[in-house]
Amino acid sequence: MKIPIYMDYHATTPVDPRVLEAMLPYFTTEYGNAASKSHAFGWKAEEAVEAAREEVAKLIGASAKEIVWTSGATESDNLAVKGAAHFYQAKGKHLVTCKTEHKAVLDSMHALERQGFEVTFLEPERDGRLDPAKVQAALRPDTILVSVMHANNETGVVHPIAEIGRIARGAGVVFHCDAVQSIGKIPFDVEAMNVDLASISAHKMYGPKGMGALYVRRKPRVRLVAEMDGGGHERGFRSGTLNVPGIVGMGKAAELARLERDAEAVRVTALRERLRKGLEKELDLLTVNGSLEHRVPGNLNVSFAYVEGEALMMAVKDVAVSSGSACTSASLEPSYVLRAMGVSEDLAHSSIRFGLGRFSTEEEVDYTIRLFGEKVRKLREMSPLYEMVKDGVDLNQIEWANPH
């Protein structure tokens, strides 16, 4: 077993050796530009790009013509949300999303608000899932876009996307789904889920970083305004020379996900349950955040009461975990996702996200259980609040002195 142990698979995944192997020739011998139509170097590159497009499409039940390459899911989210809003704004300027979306969606929505659009931010239930009835109630005659993620990046909670998509489709509203954390882990089918636009990332499914895709439905056709001008690549949706090695890597990652996903999900779920039960046996006052029933296989988001999440992370340097999402973990604010779910500020501050994946082992899980048990107990020994609770004091009944 190698130390440190990687348990942050929602932040990124290692590149699968089979993916790297598929990519390497496109750095060295097959280095053509896929847009060069006049010679064999270009044709070979284009062939590889189209084969990868086919693989990504197959993974989500789409046609290859509906896949647009991007530099990653942040760009896909921006292109989907802003591109759809700008194209359909003559029809209306109202957008609907959820408070627990990824920052790439939320900040795109805030940018559109500054341009005169109106956004309804819906609250999830206590278990982290969004009730489709709330989406239905939020729709107005001038609503042009609904954007709801499939699986949350912090809690791993899976939203009822098929139902939300059906509601949007029935109202003639474009439906975008950020499917970054679910694709490759659980089934995702654009037809069954009534999705019009879907964001996909390579590095969340054992592919390279800086590589993504956007699914854009053709029937009924969804239109977007391009957010980047240039040579008109990718049917004008996304100009810029194609990253052929990255695309080949994403295609291979998609193929492996399609072939191995279901068996992998069973194994990783068993590891997660081993971790959860082990931690619950070692420690008291431990809360799992979000629905355990509706959740991606490798995610465990836990609050350790009376322990500061950041302090705990410093204490367990041998295990790579995170508090909050990797994109916002540099700020010491409590997780906005957990706060939107109604988790108290104290418990949100004490949350840790464990992410298990393809290369995680039972040995690593058992080591993590022992390490967290030891370190949490040590930190709680220094907590006067924990002492009081163990002595039977109800903290809610205490009148704290006002420091101001």
UniProtKB/Swiss-Prot annotation:
Pathway where it operates: Cofactor biosynthesis; iron-sulfur cluster biosynthesis
The keyword Oxidoreductase is annotated on this UniProt entry: no
Catalytic activity: (sulfur carrier)-H + L-cysteine = (sulfur carrier)-SH + L-alanine
UniProt keyword annotations, A-Z: 2Fe-2S, Cytoplasm, Iron, Iron-sulfur, Metal-binding, Pyridoxal phosphate, Transferase
InterPro entries: Aminotrans_V_dom, Aminotrans_V_PyrdxlP_BS, Cys_deSase_IscS, Cysteine_dSase, PyrdxlP-dep_Trfase, PyrdxlP-dep_Trfase_major, PyrdxlP-dep_Trfase_small
Active site as annotated: C327
Class of the enzyme per the UniProt entry, highest EC level: transferase
Cofactor: pyridoxal 5'-phosphate
SUPFAM superfamilies (alphabetical): PLP-dependent transferases
UniProt modified residues of type N6-(pyridoxal phosphate)lysine: K204
Binding site for [2Fe-2S] cluster: C327
PROSITE patterns per the UniProt record, alphabetical: AA_TRANSFER_CLASS_5
Cellular location(s): Cytoplasm
One of the record's GO cellular component terms: L-cysteine desulfurase complex
Record EC number: 2.8.1.7
GO molecular function, one term: pyridoxal phosphate binding
GO biological process terms held by the UniProt record: [2Fe-2S] cluster assembly
Pfam families: Aminotran_5
Quaternary structure annotation from Swiss-Prot or TrEMBL: Homodimer. Forms a heterotetramer with IscU, interacts with other sulfur acceptors.
Reported function: Master enzyme that delivers sulfur to a number of partners involved in Fe-S cluster assembly, tRNA modification or cofactor biosynthesis. Catalyzes the removal of elemental sulfur atoms from cysteine to produce alanine. Functions as a sulfur delivery protein for Fe-S cluster synthesis onto IscU, an Fe-S scaffold assembly protein, as well as other S acceptor proteins.
Family the UniProt entry places it in: Belongs to the class-V pyridoxal-phosphate-dependent aminotransferase family. NifS/IscS subfamily.
Protein name: Cysteine desulfurase IscS
The gene coding this protein: iscS
